[in-house]
Structure formats: C-alpha cells, structure tokens
C-alpha cells in the first residue's frame, strides 16, 4: 500500500487542530455526533444488519470507539480562559497519539485482512462505528467538564 502525500497532510492538520485551543460550545457537542450517526446510518444497506456477525462486529467496534473516546476525553485540557472567561479545550499529546493510532489501524485493516473473507467485509463496513464512538464519548467527556466548570463559575456584574 503506497502512502500518498495527502495522508501526511491530513495527519499534520489533525495534530495542529488538536493542539489549538478552542471555545467549547455545548450545542455543537451534541450536533456533531448526531450528524455523524446520520451519515453512518445512511451509508449502510438495509440487509447489512441481518447477519449476527455484522451486528456483533459493529457492536464491538462501537465499544472500542467509545473506549478510545473516553480515553481521549480524559486527556483533553479544559479550562476557563483567564482573559475572555469562556470555557476552552485543547488536546494533549496523548490524545493526538491515540487518534493517530486509530487512523493507522483503520488504514492498515485493508492490508491485514484478505478481501474474500466475510470477516473482512464486516470489519470494513463497521469501521465507521469507531469514529462515531470516539467522537461521541469525547464530546460527552467535554460536556461533563464544561458543566463542572460552568457550575462553579460566578458572574459578577
């Protein structure tokens, strides 16, 4: 499998975007996983979930994604910005490494599994559940940190 330069550009953009400090918007934390869920559900054929193997693999990959997302969510730095008073978040080095490992495993799955195998087809189709679980769990952790920080924040007028 030849690595194109686009993959390296995407990896660099992911690293830079995770290190950038952003304002946490609680409404956006809910909308993004819902849009991703809609995209994942729209990409499947209705007959896909009739096989127990496909349902089991999809469930396992969703659990793996949730576990990775909770790990990433625990590593994200969330604070109240001293100048603006807004809640901001910034990714840590550990969360960047975990995202890169997940992306590498997704790209390597095609070379590790033979294409004629039913397990290969089920895993490739279910790979969408890993980012769905990761983003959902990360956003849950961000929302919990946001609520914790804003609950103790007192507005002085």
From Swiss-Prot:
Localisation: Cell membrane
Topology of this chain in the membrane: Multi-pass membrane protein
Transmembrane portions of the chain: 29-49, 52-72, 93-113, 117-137
Entry GO CC: plasma membrane
Keywords assigned: Cell membrane, Membrane, Transmembrane, Transmembrane helix
Stated name of the protein: Uncharacterized protein YxjN
Species of provenance: Bacillus subtilis (strain 168)
